């Protein structure tokens, strides 16, 4: 998965101007983002997981513009998802 993901991010990054931000995903952010996707996929309709991660990414960009570091913004997005996602009974 990591090789494919890195290739994908690199291919997208090549389409951006050199002045644009890097699309590299720091290792310490991968697990929280995957956890967000898992929580949403298992607590709601599965189709919400990729949409939630997209919206979370936009949230992180907006919070970064406000001076909040990425790790904090990802944690905020994850906590919000946890708070509003119903837990399914086993």
Model-predicted segments: where are they?
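A short glycine/serine-rich beta->alpha loop
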Residues: 37-47, 90
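C-terminal binding/interaction regions
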Residues: 2-6, 19, 72-90
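An amphipathic alpha-helical micro-motif enriched in hydrophobic residues
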Residues: 48-62
């Amino acid at each position: 998965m990591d090789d494919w993901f890195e290739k994908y991010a690199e291919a997208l990054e090549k389409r951006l101007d050199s002045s644009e931000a890097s699309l590299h995903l720091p290792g310490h952010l991968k697990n929280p983002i995957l956890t967000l996707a898992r929580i949403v996929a298992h607590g709601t309709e599965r189709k919400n997981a990729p949409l939630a991660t997209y919206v979370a990414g936009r949230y992180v960009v907006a919070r970064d513009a406000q001076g909040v570091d990425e790790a904090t913004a990802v944690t905020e997005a994850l906590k919000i998802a946890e708070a509003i996602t119903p837990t399914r009974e086993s």
